[in-house]
């Protein structure tokens, strides 16, 4: 809801796609800078307390931003500060929540658990954009802020009340900060499945997902629609992603994790390419539905592959590395913003999608065994087990 509402609001406020992209940059850059550290903290502290505290702070940030809008005091720099603070909190949510899921269900149930987590997250991307569009068309952006504040306050209370027991650490002296980070990075480098997964993750976040920042601009400038129909565009993507996440939760098997991840990534990039060249709203809508469906293959399998390839003791650290790779997205937001100013928002997304396709195909061509691999916890350091070896 916040992403859509702020994208539309900032574009109406400034008339510049570049500032819309800057909002996306500031929201994501804390994930790049802080996630490895937060992953280490998640391995050393009570994850339930960390998650509940994160949501409480997010609720407070949203209340302050909503009050600034209601009183008419809000300026662009307030929005930038608020988005940055939100980004810091979101960089905590990802490694902590996913590590907790892995702790709770174990390797055997991880596909179903992450699939359901993604399904609920993606369903919020159906309700959120529709709510954001409706609020902006009627009550204003403050309604989106106050609604978010209420939801995060509820989430915080639920997190603190979880019957979650933190994993018991093995006795012995703790290593230093940098030694702990290095341990997580060594595990990443030694496992080729994780390496390829992270390379594609960077590509998707730099060249794929920044298109979302341009949807309000493309909707207004190219498709000639208002906030409500712009919200429907993003809700359609969320609907596709929710449907695919549920299917993955019920049907995915370890032998297919890497194929779902790779082909989902490629199909998503093709779909946003089709969206970027769509001449009408009603052609753009199905393109985003397909894009959302495909994106779920990438988003769900991304965490599943990492969690099932990583020992529980260092899972937070490795998920922190994954979150940092996701945090490269701000650079994509800047690139797409600059290209949108120079060309147009649609042309910028077209160029980004084509580049993303090339850079996703490249590692798959270099390591074709990735598509034949099966992810099994506790495998050798290479992480590659081809179907013929099982």
Predicted regions, residues:
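Substrate-agnostic recognition of the 12-TM MFS/MFS-like secondary transporter fold
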Residues: 1-3, 26-40, 46-61, 78-137, ...
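Small-residue hotspots at the loop-to-helix junctions and early N-terminal turns
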Residues: 2-5, 9, 14-24, 115, ...
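Transmembrane alpha-helix termini and helix-breaking/packing motifs in multi-pass membrane transporters
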Residues: 7-13, 66-71, 127-147, 221-222, ...
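Helix-breaking motifs and short loop linkers at transmembrane-helix boundaries and internal kinks
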Residues: 14, 46, 68-69, 73, ...
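C-terminal transmembrane bundle of multi-pass solute transporters/carriers
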Residues: 21-23, 33-37, 44, 50, ...
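Hydrophobic alpha-helical transmembrane segments
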Residues: 76-87, 109-168, 211, 233-235, ...
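Helix-loop junctions on the cytosolic side of multi-pass membrane transporters
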Residues: 99, 103, 145, 151-175, ...
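Membrane-interface helix starts
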Residues: 188-199
């Amino acid at each position: 809801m916040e992403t859509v509402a702020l994208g539309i609001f900032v574009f109406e406020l400034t008339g510049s796609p570049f500032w819309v992209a800057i909002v996306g940059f500031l929201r994501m850059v804390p994930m790049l800078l802080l996630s490895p550290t937060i992953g280490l903290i998640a391995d050393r502290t009570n994850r339930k307390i960390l998650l509940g505290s994160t949501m409480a702070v997010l609720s407070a940030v949203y209340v302050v931003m909503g009050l600034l809008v209601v009183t008419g005091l809000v300026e662009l720099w307030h929005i930038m500060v608020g988005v940055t603070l939100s980004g810091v909190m979101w960089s905590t949510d990802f490694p902590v929540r996913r590590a907790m899921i892995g702790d709770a269900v174990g390797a055997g149930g991880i596909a179903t658990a992450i699939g359901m987590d993604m399904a609920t997250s993606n369903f919020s991307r159906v309700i959120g954009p529709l709510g954001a569009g409706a609020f902006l068309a009627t009550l204003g952006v403050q309604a989106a802020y106050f609604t978010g504040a209420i939801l995060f306050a509820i989430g915080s209370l639920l997190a603190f009340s979880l019957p979650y027991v933190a994993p018991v650490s093995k006795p012995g002296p703790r290593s230093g900060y940098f030694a702990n980070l290095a341990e997580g990075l060594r595990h990443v480098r030694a496992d080729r499945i994780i390496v390829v997964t992270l390379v594609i993750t960077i590509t998707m976040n730099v060249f794929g997902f920044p298109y979302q920042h341009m949807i309000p601009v493309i909707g207004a400038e190219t498709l000639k629609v208002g906030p409500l129909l712009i919200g429907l565009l993003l809700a359609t993507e969320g609907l596709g992603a929710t449907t695919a996440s549920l299917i993955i939760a019920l049907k995915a098997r370890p032998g297919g994790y890497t194929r779902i991840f790779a082909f989902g990534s490629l199909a998503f990039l093709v779909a946003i390419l089709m969206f970027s060249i769509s001449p009408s709203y009603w052609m753009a809508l199905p393109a985003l539905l397909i894009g959302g469906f495909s994106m779920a293959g990438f988003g769900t399998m991304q965490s599943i592959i990492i969690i099932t390839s990583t020992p529980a003791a260092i899972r937070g650290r490795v998920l922190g590395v994954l979150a940092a790779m996701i945090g490269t997205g701000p650079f994509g937001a800047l690139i797409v913003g600059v290209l949108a100013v120079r060309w147009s928002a649609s042309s910028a997304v077209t160029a980004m999608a084509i580049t993303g396709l090339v850079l996703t195909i490249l590692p798959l061509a270099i390591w074709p065994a990735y598509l034949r691999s099966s992810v099994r916890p506790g495998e050798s350091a290479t992480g590659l087990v081809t179907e013929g070896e099982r």
